[in-house]
Amino acid sequence: MPKLKTRRSAAKRFKRSGSGKFMRRKAYKNHLLEHKGPDRKSRLSKKCVVSEQDAENVRAMMPYS
């Protein structure tokens, strides 16, 4: 049976944590940052966990992670 391919776009966006959950960056932190407060920008800089509903799709896109 041939190897499964990893979707490279997903591999660049998601990382697996030590406990097996997928981590992702938060949105709204690329541009138009002048009017956003420092607390908000700090909060948006942190990583967060992918929801359980989406984790199934991410797992299918990255079979070897």
Swiss-Prot record:
Gene Ontology annotations of biological process type: translation
PROSITE patterns membership: RIBOSOMAL_L35
Keywords for this protein: Ribonucleoprotein, Ribosomal protein
Record SUPFAM superfamilies: L35p-like
Molecular function, one GO term: structural constituent of ribosome
Pfam families xrefs: Ribosomal_L35p
Family statement drawn from the similarity comment of this UniProt entry: Belongs to the bacterial ribosomal protein bL35 family.
Protein name, per record: Large ribosomal subunit protein bL35
Organism name: Acaryochloris marina (strain MBIC 11017)
Encoding gene per record: rpmI
